[in-house]
Each structure stands twice: as structure tokens, then as C-alpha cells.
Amino acid sequence: MMSPTLMILISITTMAILSGESFGAMPAQCNSEFLEELPPRLRKICVAIARIWDAREMNDFVDDREYRENLPRYDSSVKRQDVDHVFLRFGKRR
């Protein structure tokens, strides 16, 4: 049976990996300075990680841009003229 300390350490490590916190940055070995010195297989892995990283950043950018574009724009100087605009009143009757 495992000791409680080891079990806690394994649990924390697993949660960090699953939540993506441990993948916050590119590995130091994938730095462009060291990339030429790496074996071909590790170079392929670094390229794959870089592509995933770029796709993730692009998705975050697109999601953020779509969110900002869908925010309502209020212009208080112009009153609405459309017929579809209806004011509803909720609360006690007088």
C-alpha cells in the first residue's frame, strides 16, 4: 500500500497535468537555440508542440474577438424607432 504522502503527491501531479497548468509554456529543450542540436525525433515533437501552441493561441484570439464583437453597443443619444421594441413592466399593479 502507498503512503499517504506519496498518494497526495501523485494526486496533485495528476490534477496539474489534466488541468493543463503544467503546459503553460514551451519546454526549454524546444527553444530555437537548442532545436538544431536535438535528434530528429525530438525535433518533430517540438514542432508538433509548437503547432498545438499556435493553434491554441489562435483559438483564444478568435474566441476573444468574437466575444468583443457580440457585445451590445449602446448609443444613448439616439432613441429606438423600431416597432419591435416593447417596454414590459413587471411588479405590483396600482
Swiss-Prot record:
Function as written in the Swiss-Prot or TrEMBL entry: Myoinhibiting neuropeptide.
The UniProt record lists the keyword Secreted: yes
Signal peptide feature range: 1-24
Protein name per UniProt: Myosuppressin
Family the UniProt entry places it in: Belongs to the myosuppressin family.
Pro-peptide positions on chain: 25-80
GO CC list: extracellular region
Subcellular location as annotated: Secreted
GO terms for biological process, alphabetical: neuropeptide signaling pathway
Residue(s) carrying Phenylalanine amide: 90
Known tissue expression: Expressed throughout the nervous system (at protein level).
Pyrrolidone carboxylic acid modified-residue sites: 81
Record key words, sorted: Amidation, Cleavage on pair of basic residues, Neuropeptide, Pyrrolidone carboxylic acid, Secreted, Signal
